[in-house]
Amino acid sequence: MAQKKGGGSTRNGRDSKPKMLGVKAFGGELITAGSIIVRQRGTKFHPGDNVGVGKDHTLYALVDGHVSFAVKGALSKHTVNVTAA
């Protein structure tokens, strides 16, 4: 027989780093080209005028201007636009 109890193990003790997702530039804000507007998983927000999409679905400005958000279409898609300044 063992003279000591088993050491046991834990199934906890780890946590994932925060992913820093969300809206980074709000409606009406003046931003520069290349600025990140939204970091997201999937396309909760869709690109509109003067907005590009990164490979991780990040939306960013293609021109300097003001950010605006809109809800369009029968499916109520949230779109992000940048109006050139």
UniProtKB/Swiss-Prot annotation:
Residues 1-10 have a biased composition (Gly residues). One of its GO terms (biological process) is translation. Residues 1-20 are annotated as: Disordered. It holds the Pfam family Ribosomal_L27. GO terms for molecular function: structural constituent of ribosome. SUPFAM superfamilies: Ribosomal L27 protein-like (SSF110324). Keywords: Ribonucleoprotein, Ribosomal protein. PROSITE patterns: RIBOSOMAL_L27. GO terms for cellular component: cytosolic large ribosomal subunit. It comes from the Bacteria. PANTHER family: LARGE RIBOSOMAL SUBUNIT PROTEIN BL27M (PTHR15893:SF0), RIBOSOMAL PROTEIN L27 (PTHR15893). NCBIfam families: L27. Belongs to the bacterial ribosomal protein bL27 family. This is Large ribosomal subunit protein bL27.
